[in-house]
């Protein structure tokens, strides 16, 4: 299997070319994903209400909390598959796919049930504005009921990513995006279901993308065919996936809890401020997508080359990726800060929402370059099998620094000051990751296996 089938062997050839060509489909897919998320926000902000806009924004960290654990396990699968593929052990690749899907099928019902039961308690913790309570609850219940599609898509993407294939994932996302936009227009504008229509559109689109992904992989790559209900579960191999992926999943879960802690404070300032925060968050996420895509590429690149015992290529690839991430982040941050007001106006005509969004961007975007360096280095270490240190680093920066400083600054200087806490957390975490990577402490995590 070679690049003609979408699968890329990154242990030979130009590291820059491999990373770039792997990143581009991921980037296009991430833009598509954010595009349909922004269509959701545009539709509800302009044709439903600010309460619906706040509901969609509040929903993200809650849904992320429930999907993050399995997303982390999928990342572990990506690393194990990449290392096996780079070392030419295709039987191990096959076993990893079977084990991942067997675990997914066994756990999806308990995850969904837990999510549905926790919707009301989490909304209480988040201090959701009473004016937006009903719409937020509706949105969360529907999206939580459809978690299978979101988690399943991430699993398919992780499997293909380990073998250097990001172009097929773009196809899955294209299907989801087109369908989601159509359903938004149909269920909100044509059939006025409000926030319920937005939630239904999201769930149906994700479910179709996941099922289409299984069909496509089984047809295109029969040697990698997914058997959701009759795969052979390799307990020892799955434990290795868990060793690498569980810290990443725990990190994502705790970061989601940290995000909910932030939202709890944000929600205390009212519906307009919450809507503005959510608009700003969407815009900063959009500008960060290239770095996110580069980080995903470096996981697969490092994994394959560690499997092939090419540490020289690992270091070369990481240097290239960090440089690309820094250049992009500096340019995009300057652009977003410069156009913060007109960009915010796209999503809401309310002056209070626009002002809150613009202020968020003006405070959060300047130190984003620190987060870019942190993100790429942590991803590189995960690709080498060292996922515990990145977890401790990021969780400490969010839970021990960002959230406490956010409350402290907001209470002392007002709501806008809370955003300074982002830069504080990123600066400390970035410095620690640079030290850990430069010291080479991540290398033994693979060699000892």
Regions found by a protein language model. Name each.
Residues 21-40, 142, 153, 176, ...:
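Transmembrane helical elements of multi-pass membrane transporters/channels
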Residues 74, 142-161, 169-177, 198-211, ...:
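Short runs within selected transmembrane alpha-helices of multi-pass transporters and secretion channels
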Residues 1-23, 81-148, 190-246, 302-367, ...:
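Short alpha-helical transmembrane segments in multi-pass integral membrane proteins
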Residues 53-113, 150-169, 263, 277-340, ...:
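Small-residue-rich hydrophobic transmembrane alpha-helices
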Residues 31, 35-53, 123-130, 186-193, ...:
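Helix-terminus/linker motif at the lipid-water interface of multi-pass membrane proteins
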Residues 10-47, 61-76, 80, 108-112, ...:
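N-terminal transmembrane alpha-helices
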Residues 20, 24, 36, 73, ...:
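Residue-level signal for transmembrane alpha-helical positions in Major Facilitator Superfamily
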Residues 26, 30, 42, 79, ...:
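Transmembrane alpha-helix boundary and packing residues in multipass membrane permease domains
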């Amino acid at each position: 299997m070679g690049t003609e089938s979408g699968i890329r062997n990154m242990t030979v050839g130009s590291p820059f070319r491999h990373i770039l060509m792997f990143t581009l489909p991921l980037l296009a897919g991430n833009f598509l994903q954010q595009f349909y998320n922004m269509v959701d926000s545009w539709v509800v902000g302009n044709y439903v209400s600010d309460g619906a806009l706040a509901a969609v924004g509040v929903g993200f960290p809650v849904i992320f909390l429930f999907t993050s654990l399995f997303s982390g396990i999928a990342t572990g699968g990506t690393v194990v598959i990449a290392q096996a593929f780079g070392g030419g052990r295709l039987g191990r690749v096959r076993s990893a796919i079977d084990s991942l899907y067997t675990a997914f099928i066994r756990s999806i019902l308990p995850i969904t049930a837990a999510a549905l039961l926790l919707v009301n308690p989490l909304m209480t913790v988040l201090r959701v504005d009473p004016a937006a309570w009903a719409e937020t609850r509706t949105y969360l219940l529907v999206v939580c009921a459809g978690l299978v599609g979101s988690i399943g898509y991430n699993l398919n993407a992780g499997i293909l990513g380990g073998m250097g294939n990001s172009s097929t994932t773009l196809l899955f996302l294209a299907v989801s995006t087109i369908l989601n936009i159509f359903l938004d227009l149909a269920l909100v504008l044509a059939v006025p279901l409000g926030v319920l229509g937005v939630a239904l559109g999201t769930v149906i689109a994700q479910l179709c993308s996941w099922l289409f992904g299984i069909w496509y992989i089984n047809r295109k790559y029969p040697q990698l065919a997914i058997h959701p209900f009759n795969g052979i579960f390799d307990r020892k191999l799955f434990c290795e996936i868990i060793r690498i992926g569980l810290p990443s999943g725990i990190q994502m879960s705790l970061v989601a809890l940290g995000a909910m802690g932030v939202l709890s404070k944000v929600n205390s300032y009212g519906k307009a401020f919450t809507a503005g925060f959510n608009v700003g968050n969407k815009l900063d996420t959009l500008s960060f997508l290239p770095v996110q895509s580069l980080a995903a590429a470096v996981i697969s690149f490092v994994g394959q080359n560690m499997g092939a015992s090419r540490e020289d290529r690992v270091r070369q690839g990481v240097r290239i990726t960090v440089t690309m991430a820094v250049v992009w982040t500096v340019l995009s941050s300057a652009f977003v800060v410069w156009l913060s007001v007109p960009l915010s106006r796209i999503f809401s005509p309310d002056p209070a929402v626009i002002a809150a969004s613009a202020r968020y961007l003006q405070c959060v975007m300047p130190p984003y370059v620190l987060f870019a360096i942190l993100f790429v280095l942590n991803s590189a270490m995960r690709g080498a099998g060292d996922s515990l240190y990145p977890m401790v680093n990021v969780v400490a920066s969010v839970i021990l620094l960002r959230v406490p400083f956010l409350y402290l600054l907001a209470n002392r200087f007002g709501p806008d000051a809370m955003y300074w806490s982002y830069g504080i957390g990123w600066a400390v975490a970035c410095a620690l990751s640079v030290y850990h990577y430069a010291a080479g402490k991540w290398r033994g995590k693979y060699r000892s296996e």
